């Protein structure tokens, strides 16, 4: 069965694994998912990620991050632009997530960027997801 929205599937797996206090979450690999995982790692939401060979191709393994008393580092993840309703934003009106406490993941002509990076570079694009 084909997957309609692989990004939403990734975010749901991360959200569910985070809620269940899993140490790792495994999902099918793609370059876009690896780039999203890289942004989440760089911003401090996950501790790392790696690619492993699975039975049906490559898998992306994301290592979730928790505080000293098992506090979750990801409070929320939300898909914004969906296959049925694409959401685009100019660099002048990119969204602020929780007043700047969270991040928006933007797909631009220069690759995936956070909202702060896109504003700094003066580029807009498709708003893929929010993380806080």
Swiss-Prot record:
Protein family membership: Belongs to the universal ribosomal protein uS8 family.
Biological process per Gene Ontology, one example term: translation
GO terms under cellular component: ribonucleoprotein complex; ribosome
The protein, known as: Small ribosomal subunit protein uS8
Gene Ontology terms for molecular function: rRNA binding; structural constituent of ribosome
InterPro entries: Ribosomal_uS8 (IPR000630), Ribosomal_uS8_CS (IPR047863), Ribosomal_uS8_sf (IPR035987)
Ranges annotated as spanning the membrane: none
Described function: One of the primary rRNA binding proteins, it binds directly to 16S rRNA central domain where it helps coordinate assembly of the platform of the 30S subunit.
Pfam families linked: Ribosomal_S8
Gene3D superfamilies: 3.30.1370.30, 3.30.1490.10
Subunit structure: Part of the 30S ribosomal subunit. Contacts proteins S5 and S12.
PANTHER family: 40S RIBOSOMAL PROTEIN S15A
Keywords of this entry: Ribonucleoprotein, Ribosomal protein, RNA-binding, rRNA-binding
């Amino acid at each position: 069965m084909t997957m309609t929205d692989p990004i939403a599937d990734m975010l749901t797996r991360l959200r569910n694994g985070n809620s269940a206090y899993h140490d790792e979450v495994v999902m099918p690999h793609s370059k876009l998912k690896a780039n999203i995982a890289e942004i989440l790692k760089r911003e401090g939401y996950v501790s790392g990620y790696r690619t492993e060979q699975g039975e049906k191709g490559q898998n992306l393994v994301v290592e979730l991050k928790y505080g000293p008393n098992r506090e979750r580092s990801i409070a929320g993840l939300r898909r914004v632009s969906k296959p049925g309703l694409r959401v685009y934003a100019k660099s002048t009106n990119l969204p602020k997530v929780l007043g700047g406490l969270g991040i928006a993941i933007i797909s631009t002509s220069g690759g995936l960027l956070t909202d702060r990076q896109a504003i700094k570079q003066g580029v807009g694009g498709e708003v893929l997801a929010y993380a806080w």
